[in-house]
From Swiss-Prot:
Functional description taken from the UniProt entry: Plays an essential role in transcription initiation and cap-stealing mechanism, in which cellular capped pre-mRNAs are used to generate primers for viral transcription. Recognizes and binds the 7-methylguanosine-containing cap of the target pre-RNA which is subsequently cleaved after 10-13 nucleotides by the viral protein PA. Plays a role in the initiation of the viral genome replication and modulates the activity of the ribonucleoprotein (RNP) complex.
SUPFAM superfamilies: PB2 C-terminal domain-like
Listed name of the protein: Polymerase basic protein 2
Annotated positions for site Avian adaptation: 627
Gene3D superfamilies (UniProt xref): Polymerase Basic Protein 2, C-terminal domain (3.30.30.90)
Amino acid sequence: MERIKELRDLMSQSRTREILTKTTVDHMAIIKKYTSGRQEKNPALRMKWMMAMKYPITADKRIMEMIPERNEQGQTLWSKTNDAGSDRVMVSPLAVTWWNRNGPTTSTVHYPKVYKTYFEKVERMKHGTFGPVHFRNQVKIRRRVDINPGHADLSAKEAQDVIMEVVFPNEVGARILTSESQLTITKEKKEKLQDCKIAPLMVAYMLERELVRKTRFLPVAGGTSSVYIEVLHLTQGTCWEQMYTPGGEVRNDDIDQSLIIAARNIVRRATVSADPLASLLEMCHSTQIGGIRMVDILRQNPTEEQAVDICKAAMGLRISSSFSFGGFTFKRISGSSVKREEEVLTGNLQTLKIRVHEGYEEFTMVGRRATAILRKATRRLIQLIVSGRDEQSIAEAIIVAMVFSQEDCMIKAVRGDLNFVNRANQRLNPMHQLLRHFQKDAKVLFQNWGIEPIDNVMGMIGILPDMTPSTEMSLRGIRVSKMGVDEYSSTERVVVSIDRFLRVRDQRGNVLLSPEEVSETQGTEKLTITYSSSMMWEINGPESVLINTYQWIIRNWETVKIQWSQDPTMLYNKMEFEPFQSLVPKAARGQYSGFVRTLFQQMRDVLGTFDTVQIIKLLPFAAAPPEQSRMQFSSLTVNVRGSGMRILIRGNSPVFNYNKATKRLTVLGKDAGALTEDPDEGTAGVESAVLRGFLILGKENKRYGPALSINELRNLAKGEKANVLIGQGDVVLVMKRKRDSSILTDSQTATKRIRMAIN
């Protein structure tokens, strides 16, 4: 009451009223600003003001039991006065120091596990190399980049379920962990975070960083993988760049990189097969990248690259609506067109049928090393503003834009015939014919395009037909800009269709992608790519084909064995034997095949002459179209390691070595697997079937000299006798028949007599 009375007295004096109304603080807006709401309006000032007080901190009453009233220097750590408006204690900043030095300690074992991404970032920075700083104009373009190194690729929903299961396992709510990656991560995190004392909310937040890809649309000049983006603020400014080599790689970047390589290899291989789409799907489904199924990665990974998008389209996934031409991503930003077939004549008077886009359109063109804005009308380039890292990159963009414009002077600039073909030896479509032609040599195109004088516009210069810059003249309609063109930022995905030749179209029928757009660049994948499909065996060379073929036979031996005896033709036509044919000398393929098929037929005709190892060894040779000949072979040649190597019909060789004791097969010294059944099950083995034209007289007779091998028998005259080594090392006496007889009767009697002779 005293206070109020005092205030009333003050207010009655005119001077007080004048001070309060005339000075600026009475602005109601200002008073409101600083007094309304719980949000601190000037945190820095508030902090300074608070810290100037003796006890700026409030704490729970329990602190009085945990901290002494005074420290060793005798300074007071907390005040006995209660905090106004609450039952908390006023505490000095010195109490924090005391607590840090003398307070209870807790286990730090979980910190690196929870704050894994931070710890890993520090390691990468420690081992990274920072190079010199260069001052130069930076052409940055906004790209969608991954800002979060070291993450898995779960969707937000999948990650949410994993986090709930790990951090709040007892909370109610339906959680369905279906994908393999979800289950693996959940199991691993539960084990690692047992008895973790860190606040659950913090754990949840850190887990999210580890599980979900976070992307931002940022201006970048240079590397776009996440280990570069995390140091973007250190490596590029407006007018400077600092060289940097990351001190470590992260799995998400490695997956992105390996996925692109796998997709390119698969699309290239599918293009040359009889049914590209079916082959592509078969390969995507049977390939693993770093131990994860490629189809799972494709479903989760947002990487946009031509080959990757073709694979996604084949799987029925949505992809970006932009289209690709000449290695540039085109996005229409305004205008529209209708398509019409038109016949045009090249400078060489060759007729081309092109699909002309009629109408005014504007596009952004984004490539790895150059970007541009293109404005065009029907078969006319109106304006192209291009920016790039160097002369070469700018020239590439200009060629693509000139071809895309479909201008007559471009078509008339063609010298010579257009007959480019793709990997499957099919002619390319006319637009890609033109593109390839000018990518090889664009001199005539640039000379014929025409030049024009230019106005002085800030940030733009001209470019001459020889690709040198100029401030006076430029190629008609074309300017070079210092500023880059941003990548298309939208993450919108559209439904597309794909035909059997892997051409991807949007719902209006526009071609977005085709195999011609897939880069030929070869790279080495960071993660192991395992192609289980036989179509990809060739990728690692002849040795890989050889080993993979035999591994496949051994893995599938149960079914192969049945087919071998019941339906050999179907077996010989299996695509798994296709790659092997490239190893067999062309001239010998048909003869080898005929010989092996005859041999197999003899085995089938004669019971008990089944030799597993020999069938496995010779089977791939039977896949070629057979030639009927009476040729006999003791060995078959395959071209590996740069020369012909022999596979012996009987017995082991460096190429094909079967160890009876371990039952394991080695091909070129590499393990190709184990035979689960006993290969000796066929008693006498295949040899009896090869004894065509011989009579078996009985057991070995030393009078006739040492045992010959089956191949040496060929030299015997009719009626001559000899000892011969057959089967598993048994020796019998034979006589060459005086007349030719059927294979069948010979083989049947041979089998019976061998049994008698041995027993």
